[in-house]
């Protein structure tokens, strides 16, 4: 059982406090997921330690690192890793059945350029991810906390943006977000436009077309069924 951190922010996006609990949202692992966790964790799983990772040691090469926060069941992350063997992919997901499903798919796909963690992403960022080291950070379909009184719980806040900025490679690292909630998309733009050291790479300074390298996720398919649009947003670290 791992610590999970829930952050609360004020209206200015500043961190007020961290609420810690020891509930991992375990869920029930299927036999296939449990088998994948047991078999694949030694080669693809990374245990939480409060010390910085060495990407060359983790992956055995110097290829660019793409990190995804909250990969769900991992299908799109595995597909991206399979389609881009010249990159390394690192996924963080707090829901263990999702990690098991991701490992099962990765094993079936025969990919070797993927590593996963089952832990709170903020703690991993604070203690394990080296500064200036990520080519891309992916945040796809995070919890929109659609009620206005809950907007302060959204992960995309100024404090989080600064943490992301520190981890991206200077002058080239990309923060790629996607959401099927228009209000959250507008919130992302508003926060990131305030965040120092970032530049929106969209031609109109708003949203980018859906990138071909981002696979269709179940959340996106759900959004289409509900009549929602999907918004992709990319910011580049420029300082």
Swiss-Prot record:
PANTHER family given in the database record: 3-DEOXY-D-MANNO-OCTULOSONIC-ACID TRANSFERASE/TRNA GUANINE-N 7 - -METHYLTRANSFERASE, PENTACOTRIPEPTIDE-REPEAT REGION OF PRORP DOMAIN-CONTAINING PROTEIN
Gene: trmB
Coiled coil (residue ranges): none
Tree of life domain: Bacteria
Major enzyme class: transferase
The protein's role, per its UniProt record: Catalyzes the formation of N(7)-methylguanine at position 46 (m7G46) in tRNA.
Disulfide bridge partners, by residue number: none
Gene Ontology molecular function terms on file: tRNA (guanine(46)-N7)-methyltransferase activity
tRNA processing listed as a keyword: yes
Protein name as catalogued: tRNA (guanine-N(7)-)-methyltransferase
Residue positions of the active site: 143
HAMAP family cross-referenced by the UniProt entry: tRNA_methyltr_TrmB (MF_01057)
Keywords: Methyltransferase, S-adenosyl-L-methionine, Transferase, tRNA processing
GO CC, any one term: tRNA methyltransferase complex
E.C. number: 2.1.1.33
């Amino acid at each position: 059982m791992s610590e999970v951190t829930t952050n609360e922010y004020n209206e200015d996006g500043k961190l007020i406090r961290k609420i810690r609990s020891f509930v991992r949202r375990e869920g029930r692992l299927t036999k296939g997921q449990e088998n994948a966790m047991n078999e694949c964790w030694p080669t693809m799983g990374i245990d939480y330690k409060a010390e910085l990772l060495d990407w060359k040691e983790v992956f055995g090469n110097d290829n660019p690192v793409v990190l995804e926060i909250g990969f769900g069941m991992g299908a799109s992350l595995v597909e991206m890793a399979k389609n881009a063997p010249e990159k390394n992919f690192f996924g963080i997901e707090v829901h263990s059945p999702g990690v098991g499903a991701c490992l099962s798919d990765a094993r079936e796909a025969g990919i070797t350029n993927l590593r996963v963690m089952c832990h709170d992403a903020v703690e991993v960022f604070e203690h394990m991810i080296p500064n200036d080291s990520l080519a891309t950070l992916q945040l796809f379909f995070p919890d929109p906390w659609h009620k206005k009184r809950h907007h302060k719980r959204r992960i995309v806040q100024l404090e989080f943006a600064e943490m992301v900025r520190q981890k991206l490679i200077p002058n080239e690292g990309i923060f790629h977000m996607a959401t099927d909630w228009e209000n959250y998309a507008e919130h992302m733009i508003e926060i990131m436009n305030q965040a120092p050291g970032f530049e929106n790479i969209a031609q109109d300074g708003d949203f980018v077309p859906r990138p071909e390298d981002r696979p269709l996720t179940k959340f996106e398919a759900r959004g289409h069924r509900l009549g929602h649009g999907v918004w992709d947003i990319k910011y580049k670290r420029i300082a």
